[in-house]
Each structure stands twice: as C-alpha cells, then as structure tokens.
Regions:
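Conserved G1/Walker A P-loop phosphate-binding module
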Residues: 1-63, 76-77
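Conserved C-terminal guanine-recognition region of P-loop GTPase G domains, centered on the G4
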Residues: 42-45, 69-139
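Canonical P-loop GTPase G-domain recognition
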Residues: 116-168
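Extended, hydrophilic extramembrane loops/domains of integral membrane proteins
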Residues: 184-206
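Short, membrane-interfacial amphipathic segments enriched in basic
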Residues: 202-216, 258-266
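Membrane-interface helix starts
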Residues: 210, 214, 222-232
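Hydrophobic core segments of alpha-helical transmembrane domains in multi-pass membrane transport
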Residues: 232-241
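Interfacial/capping segments of alpha-helical transmembrane domains
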Residues: 242-268
Length: 268
C-alpha cells in the first residue's frame, strides 16, 4: 500500500521549494480528481513515501476551490502524516492554518522554513517552546540553502511510521448561537484560531524593536487625551497662519522676481 505524506501551508512560505528539495526530479504534476486545481506528487528521496503538495491556502474554512481540495484531501485520510510548512519570519500568519489542520490530522510536523530570512530581520524563535505549545515536532530549516532538510526527512519518516509522539494543541471556541449562519460560524472559528495563533507567537517569537513599534508609541502620544488636543490646536494654528500670512511670502517673492525679469522687455 502506498504511504502518502501531505505538504500544507499558506502561499509564499517556500512550500514548493521544500517539496522540490525533498523529491528532486521524482515528481509529476496533474489535477485533483474532478477539479481544475493543480496538484504535485513526488517520491521522497530514498523511496518508500509519496509526498503530495497541497494547494497553498490561508484557511481550511474558506470556500475557494483550492481550499476545498486541500480540506477534502486531509479529511479523506489519504495522508498518513502532514508536513505544515511555515514562514519563520511571519509565524503567526502560518499558525492559523496549522491549527486548523491539526484538528483533522494529528500526526503532523511543523517545518519552520525561511529561518535564514528571519535571522536577517533579527527574529528569534524558541523552537522548544513552539513544540510544547503545538504539541508536535518542529524542524527549523532553510530549504533554499539546503539547511535542515536531512532532519526534516528523518522526522517525516518517523511520523509516517507512527514513531512521533504528538499531543496537538486545541483551539478554544466560544459558545455559538444556534441561529448563526454557516458563514458566521466560520468567521468566529477563524477568529478563535487567529487568537490562539497570536498567543503562541507571543510566547515563542522575539522580534527586534522596529519602526512599527516607534510608530505605535508616537500614536500613543498624539492620540492621548493629555497631548492630543493641544497638538491638534497647534496644528490648526499653523495651518491658519500659513493660510493668512504665510502665503504672502512666496507670492511677494514671485511677484518681485517676475517683474524684474520683465523690466528689460518693457523698455524695448
């Protein structure tokens, strides 16, 4: 019986790079049965396992054809394990999908890709803490540089053999009214997943102070009750001054110099 491992992730996290690095030239591309969504399959280096590259999707709860195809494949039980590919530089965004996948497939691995790019930005991730929070193995790697791929391949084989002990975290959903529509329920469920993803990211990710943090502090001052009104009045006074008096300076300068330019022609 063919054993299949699925690769899942949001767009632009390097999932295809990971897939190509793990399969090399032993792959082919086709369409999902009854769908126009492209799929790729390949044999893991060393043989014994088939990797299926699922369509990139931000959520399993949305309704695009790609998202339906990914969810149907995971729910069908065709995959004995799932590799969740995440962007180390934007971990929180990747975790929303990862948490949703863990609800339908417990046997999973998180591939923390693009670690090199995260390091350039000064982002540090506590891998051990992330493993504790998610309850699954986490493998840091940089697929484009070939770093961490041997460890990832070994983890995939252990997972496919059922040797990885996993205790996936659960999303805490609020109580929902029976009158809610399916779309409203999906929105609430996605918000709950986003909240859990934020909690995990705050625990495991350390980012350097950046321009956005400085902007937040500036907003706190400008929009505060103590300084906001005086700053607004000062700004309005400046605009009022420029409107009544400030405009005279450039207009007088232009008038003087333009008249001076026209003087030679006036005497001709």
């Amino acid at each position: 019986m063919r054993r299949t491992v699925a690769l899942a992730g949001i767009p632009n996290v390097g999932k295809s790079t990971v897939f190509n690095a793990l399969t090399g030239s032993r792959q082919h591309t086709g369409n999902w049965s009854g769908k126009t969504v492209a799929c790729a399959e390949g044999r893991l280096r060393g043989g014994g396992l088939t990797l299926t590259d699922l369509p990139g999707t931000y959520s399993l709860r949305a309704h695009s054809e790609e998202e339906r195809a990914a969810r149907e494949f995971l729910v069908s039980g065709q995959a004995c394990a799932v590799v969740l590919v995440a962007d180390a530089g934007c971990l929180e965004r990747s975790l929303i999908l990862a948490l949703q996948v863990l609800e339908v497939q417990k046997n999973a691995i998180l591939c923390l890709n693009l670690m090199d790019e995260a390091a350039k930005k000064g982002i540090e991730i506590d891998v051990a803490a992330l493993e504790r929070e998610l309850g699954i193995p986490v493998i840091p790697c940089a697929a484009r540089q070939g770093k961490g791929l041997h460890e990832l391949e070994a983890a995939i084989r252990r997972s496919a053999a059922g040797e990885n002990e996993t205790h996936p975290t659960a999303i805490r959903y609020p109580a929902m009214d029976e009158d809610l529509t399916e779309e409203q329920r999906d929105d609430i469920a996605t918000a709950a997943a986003a909240l859990r993803a934020e909690e995990i990211a705050l625990t495991c990710v350390r980012q350097p102070e950046c321009a956005c943090a400085r902007d937040d502090r500036a907003d706190d001052v400008i929009l505060s009750r103590r300084f906001g009104v005086p700053l607004m009045l000062l700004l309005l006074a400046g605009v009022f001054y420029l409107t009544l008096f400030g405009a005279n300076v450039p207009s007088e300068w232009l008038s003087t110099h333009l008249l001076a330019l026209g003087t030679p022609f006036a005497g001709a």
